């Protein structure tokens, strides 16, 4: 099945949205850093915890996760800090 959108694996990281995990206090300098990045093609990359298995049995009726997709959870502070950097339409 052809999907109307596909992730482009050759897109490069352009800029961080919001503050770094260190600035927000959501990391202890380990490699576990939640983050949101705009890619050079306009898409966004989210670094967070993969909770696909934990949520699989309790998705809302109109939500589905394809085999190549994951449910990624980030701290609220990460998204709130990015709000002013998210481009408008």
Language-model-detected regions and their locations in the chain:
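Short amphipathic alpha-helical surface micro-motifs
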Residues: 26-29, 53-57
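Short, charged/polar N-terminal "headpieces" of proteins
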Residues: 1-31
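Surface-exposed, flexible loop/turn segments at secondary-structure boundaries
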Residues: 44, 52
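Glycine-centered structural positions embedded in regular secondary structure
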Residues: 18, 47-48
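Short, surface-exposed polybasic-aromatic patches that bind anionic ligands, especially phosphate groups
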Residues: 32, 46
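Helix-rich interaction surfaces within compact, conserved domain-sized segments
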Residues: 48, 55-89
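Short, surface-exposed charged micro-motifs
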Residues: 35
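Short acidic-glycine loop/turn motifs at beta-strand connectors
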Residues: 39-42
């Amino acid at each position: 099945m052809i999907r109307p959108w596909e992730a482009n694996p050759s897109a490069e990281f352009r800029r961080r949205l919001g503050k770094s995990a260190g600035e927000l206090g959501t990391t202890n300098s380990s490699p576990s850093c939640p983050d949101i990045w705009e890619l050079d093609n306009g898409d966004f990359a989210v670094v967070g915890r993969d909770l696909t298995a934990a949520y699989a049995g309790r998705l809302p009726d109109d939500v589905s996760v394809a085999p190549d997709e994951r449910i990624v959870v980030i701290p609220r502070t990460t998204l709130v800090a990015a709000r002013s950097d998210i481009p408008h339409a």
